[in-house]
Amino acid sequence: MTSHTTAAALATLGAAGMVMLAGIAHAAEIRVIGSPGTRAPYTRLVPGFEKATGHKVVTVWGGVNDVAKRVADGETADVVMLPAAQIDGLIKQGKLIPDSRVDVAKSGIGVAIRAGAAKIDISSAEGLKKALLAVKTIAYSTGPSGVYMADLIRKWGIADQVKSKIVPARRNVPIGVMVAAGEAEIGFQQVSELLPVEGIDYLGPLPPDIQETTVFSAAVHKAAGAADAGRALLKFLTAPEAAPVIRKTGMEPG
């Protein structure tokens, strides 16, 4: 997608938002807490929402497990954004409003190496398996992509062989940043989280036969102080006009 096309999509979205949200009379501050899986499209879309509505969006990012635990333990916000499984869990716990739940975007797992490093064959599952056995260090997140990679390694029967190669993920540090710094030879994370990172070569997504797609969802907190504005934000993020912006970041609309 060209920058002109992206700008046009944002302009259209802003115009749509003006009509869609015209019924909201007073500007509010919306507190959002979430994991960074949707950060790339979210940060492109939110300014248009703020311009269209006058609302101010304040966002706090954290790891999937960290954010889910904080909300489960009583932390409040207006909107919570996490992988679908965590959102559904918090709804079951009575923390989030069920009928406010939306799927915002979805992403597969990508693979990256340090910029300039020798390319690795990830075109097939067998090629990727051989790569993991050959490299000295491996990094993956503590979120859904990392859980999946750990399971995949176990299914391949190479967990014992690569155990000493796994570099623990650092809190709130993207895997791409660790790879760029040379902390790991190869890294795995959501495509949308790898693409913005400088200092890495993005090799592409996992082969189709072993790919895992994570759906990122959001819902309004039951204790929200700006529930109506929060619902309006979710409507904006999931409007058809948002789709081109979401795709630009390597994700698909939810």
Describe these PLM feature segments.
Residues 1-6:
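N-terminal secretory signal peptides that target proteins for export/translocation
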Residues 7-8, 63:
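Hydrophobic alpha-helical segments, principally membrane-spanning helices and signal/leader peptides
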Residues 11-22:
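Bacterial N-terminal signal peptides
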Residues 26-75, 81-107, 113-254:
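Exported/periplasmic ABC-transporter solute-binding proteins
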